[in-house]
Amino acid sequence: MKKFCIIANRDKDENLTITQTMLEFLEANGKTVYVTEESCLEGSYTDVSGIPKDVECAIVLGGDGTILQAAHDLLQLDIPILGVNLGTLGFLAEIETLTMKQAFSKLFLNQYNIESRMMIDATVFKEGQSLSSHKVSAINDVVITRSGFSRIIGVSIFINGEVVQNYRGDGVIISTPTGSTGYNLSAGGPIVTPKAEMIMITPICPHSLNARSIIVTSDDTVEIQIRESKKTQEEEAIVTVDGSFSMELQANDRILIKKAKERVKLVRLEGHSFFHLLRTKFGDK
């Protein structure tokens, strides 16, 4: 790899010290580096839309939220992403700041792989009509939760048009394998290797003894319907995609979820397996 761009979260790297160190290190090794305006250093700057198509890798400094946002911004450019963890757990990040230079040495020696990971599309239906303007893609998850301080909500889960679960609770998470270590994990859902092609459906605090996580193939379609409550209110629930896009839902609204055509590409260095990452993040030796 010879051409890079750097996207930094200034809330995580306030004085851009880490960004500056990385820029100098890459340029000292003969690499061409672009830095987004949000990162604002000296040199060749560009916003995300102006990043040249021949950039081979986007280096993102921040937590998982920063990496997710950058991945969405760069999706149409099809640029692989290498995350540098400035957050807490950082499951999407490949590099820790303390081992940054050693990690980049592997990159320069072509000791890496590019993982192509599946995404999911979510389309909202209101009164039976698809809101095409509200079709969004998720790298991690689509989360449907109760609105504000409302009561628990009722949901119906359909797979390929067939109802499989009805329950009341705080909501439901539909996640990709990449998102299985996020909110899905916190809600008691399964951990799935990110190379898998499947969709996880995990209830959030269900008021039921029978509601459990369900795993389906990537060829299946999942549909969530908001059920009517005894005391219907204007805003029953909220759907959130990758922690950013959100939309209010009413009773009988539906969300159709299926595998997306787009895929996100993440750089993985040799010797950094998913299971090694799990042991490291969870503190197991």
From Swiss-Prot:
Keyword field contains Nucleotide-binding: yes
Enzyme Commission numbers on file: 2.7.1.23
UniProt keyword terms in alphabetical order: ATP-binding, Cytoplasm, Kinase, NAD, NADP, Nucleotide-binding, Transferase
The keyword Cytoplasm is assigned to this record: yes
Pfam families the record matches: NAD_kinase (PF01513), NAD_kinase_C (PF20143)
GO MF annotation terms: ATP binding; metal ion binding; NAD binding; NAD+ kinase activity
Main location as per UniProt: cytoplasm
Reaction catalysed by this enzyme: NAD(+) + ATP = ADP + NADP(+) + H(+)
Entry's Gene Ontology cellular component terms: cytoplasm
Residues given in the record as NAD(+) binding sites: D64, G65, N140, D141, R151, R168, D170, T181, G182, Y183, N184, L185, S186
Active-site residue numbers: D64 (proton acceptor)
Essential cofactor(s): a divalent metal cation
GO BP of this protein: NAD metabolic process; NADP biosynthetic process
Subcellular location per the Swiss-Prot or TrEMBL entry: Cytoplasm
Function: Involved in the regulation of the intracellular balance of NAD and NADP, and is a key enzyme in the biosynthesis of NADP. Catalyzes specifically the phosphorylation on 2'-hydroxyl of the adenosine moiety of NAD to yield NADP.
PANTHER family membership: NAD KINASE (PTHR20275:SF0)
Family: Belongs to the NAD kinase family.
Protein name: NAD kinase
Gene designation per UniProt: nadK
